[in-house]
């Protein structure tokens, strides 16, 4: 997948959403550092030109700046990725600065923060109230000032996305945040149409579920009627020559 995408995109984010769309977890909270490293290694084997960023999962960086550095440095050393991403509440500013000062490129994440879904009230758009909108803007500015090279803006209104983009001097990458951001990102299985239900902000650019379903149906039918394997799929015995 990474090899196919590589020539068409500037950046590949190995996001902790893989816990839900690949491993079937109910949220990103159960994703481990080992899972992120495994998937990061796989992406790095396929990607040759895109900037590869790997998420630090829940519980791997919040306890202290030192914990964050240990996790981030391990991810970078074991995967070979170029940067890490952390969700950026007010608590994260000092952590971002600490990491950047020690050579870890950091992408931040504001707005809807899936790792904090239990305290934010679930997966829903953020910033519809003035107080929360102001908090999102402040978090983005703080993350930029702390040294983040880019910020993901998720699940906010067009107005908030525009304010964030205008307020920071780093690229804003939107997901459910309108075209007011400098760039866009989507969860690949969502974008490829692997699931019936996707968030409102997703556009399905393919219908992989239908293609896969039809392929499996055809395969099963041909196995049952013995039309597969056919002549083109067989190896022929060749008697040894004396």
Question: What are the residue ranges of the model-derived segments?
Answer:
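Alpha/beta enzyme core
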Residues: 1-240
